[in-house]
A protein has these predicted regions:
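Conserved N-terminal phosphate-binding loop of PLP-dependent enzymes in the Aspartate aminotransferase
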Residues: 1-128
Length: 128
């Protein structure tokens, strides 16, 4: 979620077994691969994640978000399911999510959409 903390960066992980069956040298590349600036940014982010013990913090606070979203799903017929992991959550909605997202913003809540029927809730990893 916050791999670069604002610096554009992407990554993926796979087991060696999957890599051996999926990739050969040269199969995966990028224009900016090996960029030292991005590498330094990611390294600094990881250092801060360790210093602040972000993973433990997310494990502590995520159940609260999950519980509150589950309560909303139970309360409103237009919300049909919650899905996600940790602090990356989505709620399926039977209403046009663009309109719901716009009204949420009018009420002071930033909610983004994912596809045509999901409201995404992605708070900062340092949320209390």
């Amino acid at each position: 979620k916050a791999l670069g903390c604002g610096v554009p960066v992407g990554a993926f992980l796979m087991t060696q077994r999957v890599a051996d069956k999926s990739l050969a040298p040269g199969d995966h590349g990028t224009t900016y691969g090996g960029n030292p600036f991005v590498g330094a940014a990611v390294s600094a982010v990881f250092d801060e994640f360790k210093r602040l013990d972000i993973v433990s913090h997310v494990k502590d606070v995520a159940p609260y978000l999950e519980k509150k979203l589950d309560e909303l799903v139970a309360k409103f017929d237009c919300l049909t399911a919650r899905r996600g992991m940790g602090l990356m959550q989505g709620v399926e909605c039977s209403l046009p999510v663009g309109k719901v997202s716009a009204e949420a913003l009018n009420q002071g809540l930033i909610v983004i959409t994912a596809g045509s029927n999901v409201l995404r809730f992605v708070p900062p990893l340092v949320i209390e």
